[in-house]
Amino acid sequence: MHLAVLSCLMQCNSSSWYAQQRGLSSPEYHLNVLKRLYSVNNEALRICSGAFKSSPISSLQAECNEIPPQLRHQQLALQYAIKLKANRENPAYDDIFHGDDPLADYESDASSSSEGKAESSDEEYRNTLKEKRKSLPPTFCGRLQEVATDCEVPFDLISHQGIPDVEPWLVRVPSIDYRLAVLPKAKTNPHQYKALYKEVVEFYGNYSHVYTDGSKKDEKVGSAAVWLDTTRKTRLPNGCSIFTAEASALIDALKLISESDTTRFIIFTDSLSCLQAIENEDMSNTLIHTYLSDYTELVSNGKEVVMCWIPSHIGIEGNEKADAAAKSSLDDDITPMSVPYSDFLPKVREYFHNLWQGWWERRTDFLALIHPILNKKIYDPTLSRREQRALCRIRIGHSRLTHAHIMDKHAEKPMCAECNCRLSMKHIMVDCPKYQHERSSFLDGSTTEEIYNNSDRAIINFVKECGFLNLL
């Protein structure tokens, strides 16, 4: 319910967040809207996790692996712009990428109508425009520029998803041999694969062999296609996916075929996902679209091309050559080319996750001490709802036992009767000598990090033995 309804409402209010951050466009109104929305969102996180009412919002978000809405709004805006860049026919395209001044048209019309007026009137008019700009929120384009620059998104490399060059009913799909893909790679001996590969070679005895492969190391991406002694390599833009590398290699293979006088070819590739995308005629991917268009043209020119999947790194000579060529292309200069917009979406998600991680590292929450790296916490599925709720409160450090006084201004802070010190979850779990016997029976370690690193079941058993489960 939270993800399906509340998160969507929060995301739709991203413009209010931008305006409030910049102090523009009735900030009091936007601040009130955000407070109401954030309050509902925070309450939903508390209900989902079972956290106590006084739990810090940052800890709630970290425990639920819910990125703060301020960052989420920016992430969604940038992802939308990346998708829009691939669709230039979208009516919003020009406004998003070229509409950086909300008063540009107004200024142009007014200036043309004010020709012949006194210079003092022009100066007064310009001052009026400046004041209007201060009261207006920045446009989507203006807000986006700073975020896109920080994230280093190469908008100029995003390929255009236009209308296909070839009519859909004229597109030809190659024949694909999947006989080697039937066997599970993890359980199949390489010699068995090689035997099946020889059967394929014999079956297509009069076909020339082309081998393709893609390679990725850190941010560097490359691809290669090998036919006899001819190799065609491509160094792709940094950050491209391995799928894009494999698809680029297949396109290079068709280029090798088009330059040859030989008629029959079989392309061997170890990318099952690319073959399936080609078979399904996935025109949403610009590289698959290009491959099918090039293949259709080759077939119309009298070429015969079939494809076959082979496993990688089992000693097939042609595949090993293609793999070596693809790896060597990583040291080449980047080839100017456009790539699908989807390749840059993971980079955006990683950028904002790292930004959130930086925020989290500066927090002093108790959860930040035991959970310094942000990732999804998966509770032991055998725990009951009550036990999961208790575990969440133990991890965040806020519970009814230790923080109920915050809800009642007349209540006093709870004290440990054994140690005469402030009662806290850390004191119960780590320090209090009263529970040393139970601690040594159920938990391993002596430091806070070591004790909280025990299994969920062990921590719950310790709390049960101490008699605190129903008090949290």
Ranges and model annotations:
Residues 23-431, 438-472:
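RNase H-like, metal-dependent ribonuclease domains
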Residues 1-19:
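Basic, alpha-helical interaction scaffolds
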